[in-house]
């Protein structure tokens, strides 16, 4: 049990490093909110529940392997004006926000969850296109 918890803490730390101050500054210098800031702005305070935050991704781009958690998209659900809504917010700082296999699977998962509950889906797009893997 302790090992599992230590792995979880290591993932939390890696995710926090992935979205550090340099990342925020880069987005703000472009006149953009970060993917997480867009989610926080959209949903009623404290209601957003992220889905698959720790989905691992390892893609090769220009001969370099890029490892990240979440694969450049934040997915989940929460309330907007008290109504349940599902959403995804693409992160341009991870592979240009491009759509890869893990990224697409996360979006499809929240779309399926929304369909089952009769809830709307909001997509916050900040993407350079698709990764053809």
Regions found by a protein language model. Give the residues of each.
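Terminal-region recognition feature
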Residues: 1-133
């Amino acid at each position: 049990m302790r090992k599992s918890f230590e792995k979880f803490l290591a993932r939390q730390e890696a995710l926090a490093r992935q979205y550090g101050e340099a990342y925020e500054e880069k987005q703000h210098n472009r006149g953009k909110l970060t993917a997480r800031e867009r989610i926080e702005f959209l949903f009623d305070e404290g209601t957003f529940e992220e889905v698959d935050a720790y989905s691992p991704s390892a893609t090769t781009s220009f001969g370099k392997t890029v490892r990240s958690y979440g694969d450049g998209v934040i997915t989940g659900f929460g309330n907007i004006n008290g109504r349940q809504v599902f959403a995804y917010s693409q992160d341009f700082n991870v592979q240009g926000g491009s759509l890869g296999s893990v990224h697409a699977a996360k979006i499809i998962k929240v779309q399926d969850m929304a369909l089952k509950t009769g809830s709307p889906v909001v997509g916050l797009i900040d993407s350079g296109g698709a990764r053809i893997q």
